[in-house]
């Protein structure tokens, strides 16, 4: 790891992803007296300063947040429950449900497809998803036979072109499903974003982390 990347022993590094999670984390940081001083949507920088010289933000893919925190490249981060369910919790402590970026993970099929009857008859379904581990566990518990097809985006396209019978994906308003003539048939789990902390950092930097974690907890409780 290059010296330019390394933080000082007293500095805290927060891992965030662009988009909804970043935007909805800003008020929580403000509650801790911290402002991110550059916008990741307009800046090319991946390491952003904050109003607190002892705290910096790194911008990573949403699915990579737990990895950066697990291996200590970040002291703490914000990740969706969907990401954490796929990644696992090794080396991580997740003390707070932040009550942000809420949605649900669901099974969806083309309108007119009799999902309940297909499952009842023991049909083997092709399911497109990027949440392979979570989907596998869900269908195994229900005794549903599936072939899982890993995709990284545009899940809705799978059933439309005959790649899959169903999809497992995140649903917020359901507008994308409706636009593609898909219907939600089964909710797997409610999703929100969690604060995740590196277990070693929690011990070694507790004095610096504790006030921020407390502020996050108070602010997120108001959102519940």
Curated annotation (Swiss-Prot):
Annotated GO MF terms: ATP binding; ATP phosphoribosyltransferase activity
Pathway note: Amino-acid biosynthesis; L-histidine biosynthesis; L-histidine from 5-phospho-alpha-D-ribose 1-diphosphate: step 1/9
GO biological process, one term: L-histidine biosynthetic process
Enzyme Commission code: 2.4.2.17
GO cellular component labels: cytoplasm
Gene3D superfamilies for the chain: Periplasmic binding protein-like II (3.40.190.10)
A Pfam family that the UniProt record links to this protein: HisG
Record-linked PROSITE patterns: ATP_P_PHORIBOSYLTR
Keyword terms, alphabetized: Amino-acid biosynthesis, ATP-binding, Cytoplasm, Glycosyltransferase, Histidine biosynthesis, Nucleotide-binding, Transferase
Catalytic reaction annotation: 1-(5-phospho-beta-D-ribosyl)-ATP + diphosphate = 5-phospho-alpha-D-ribose 1-diphosphate + ATP
InterPro entries: ATP_PRibTrfase_cat (IPR013820), ATP_PRibTrfase_CS (IPR018198), ATP_PRibTrfase_HisG (IPR001348), ATP_PRibTrfase_HisG_short (IPR024893)
Localisation: Cytoplasm
SUPFAM superfamilies linked: Periplasmic binding protein-like II
Purpose: Catalyzes the condensation of ATP and 5-phosphoribose 1-diphosphate to form N'-(5'-phosphoribosyl)-ATP (PR-ATP). Has a crucial role in the pathway because the rate of histidine biosynthesis seems to be controlled primarily by regulation of HisG enzymatic activity.
UniProt domain comment: Lacks the C-terminal regulatory region which is replaced by HisZ.
Family: Belongs to the ATP phosphoribosyltransferase family. Short subfamily.
Quaternary context: Heteromultimer composed of HisG and HisZ subunits.
PANTHER family for this protein: ATP PHOSPHORIBOSYLTRANSFERASE, ATP PHOSPHORIBOSYLTRANSFERASE ATP-PRTASE
Protein known as: ATP phosphoribosyltransferase
UniProt source species: Cupriavidus metallidurans (strain ATCC 43123 / DSM 2839 / NBRC 102507 / CH34)
């Amino acid at each position: 790891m290059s010296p330019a990347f390394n933080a000082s022993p007293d500095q805290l590094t927060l891992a965030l992803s662009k988009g909804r999670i970043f935007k909805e984390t800003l008020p929580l940081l403000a509650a801790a007296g911290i402002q991110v001083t550059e916008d990741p949507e307009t800046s090319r920088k991946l390491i952003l300063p904050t109003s607190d010289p002892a705290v910096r933000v790194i911008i990573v893919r949403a699915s990579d947040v737990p990895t950066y925190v697990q291996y200590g490249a970040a002291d703490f981060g914000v990740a969706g429950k969907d990401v954490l369910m796929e990644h696992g919790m090794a080396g991580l402590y997740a003390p707070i449900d932040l009550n942000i970026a809420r949605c649900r993970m669901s099974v969806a099929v083309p309108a007119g497809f009799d999902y309940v009857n297909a499952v009842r008859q023991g049909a083997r379904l092709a399911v497109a998803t990027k949440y392979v581990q979570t989907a596998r566990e869900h269908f195994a518990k229900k005794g549903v036979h599936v072939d899982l097809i890993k995709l990284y985006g545009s899940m809705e396209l799978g059933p439309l072109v005959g790649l899959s019978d169903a999809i497992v994906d995140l649903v917020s308003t359901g507008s994308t499903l409706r636009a593609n003539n898909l219907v939600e048939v089964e909710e797997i789990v409610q999703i929100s974003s969690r604060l995740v902390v590196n277990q070693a950092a929690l011990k070694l930097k507790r004095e610096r982390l504790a006030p921020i974690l407390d502020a996050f907890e108070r602010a997120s409780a108001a959102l519940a």
